[in-house]
């Protein structure tokens, strides 16, 4: 009986997604707000801004990438914190 109970507990834990998934904004520049659910293991969101011949540009997404000089990067660790 104990084995059956233990098996049910293990199956329940495996079947349920007990991990937390981060939600980040992913709209570009001045587009309407959209969000994405980040891949497992991602624990931060980013907002990258720079200027080019089209004006000020913004990119948002999951993670915290490395950027070239001249690009402003803001990383944060709460849901939709990169809006």
UniProtKB/Swiss-Prot annotation:
CDD domains: TFP_snake_toxin
Record's signal peptide: 1-21
GO CC aspect terms: extracellular region
Matches recorded under PROSITE patterns: SNAKE_TOXIN
Expression tissues: Expressed by the venom gland.
Disulfide bond entries: 24-45, 38-62, 64-75, 76-81
Subcellular localization: Secreted
Superkingdom as given in the UniProt entry: Eukaryota
Family: Belongs to the three-finger toxin family. Short-chain subfamily. Type I alpha-neurotoxin sub-subfamily.
Name of the molecule in the record: Short neurotoxin 1
């Amino acid at each position: 009986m104990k084995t059956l109970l233990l098996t049910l507990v293990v199956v329940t834990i495996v079947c349920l997604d007990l991990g937390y998934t981060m939600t980040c904004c992913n709209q570009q520049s001045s587009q309407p707000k959209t969000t994405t659910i980040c891949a497992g293991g991602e624990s931060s969101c980013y907002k990258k801004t720079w200027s080019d011949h089209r004006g000020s540009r913004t990119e948002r997404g999951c993670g915290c990438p490395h950027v070239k000089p001249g690009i402003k990067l803001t990383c944060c660790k709460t849901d939709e914190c990169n809006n």
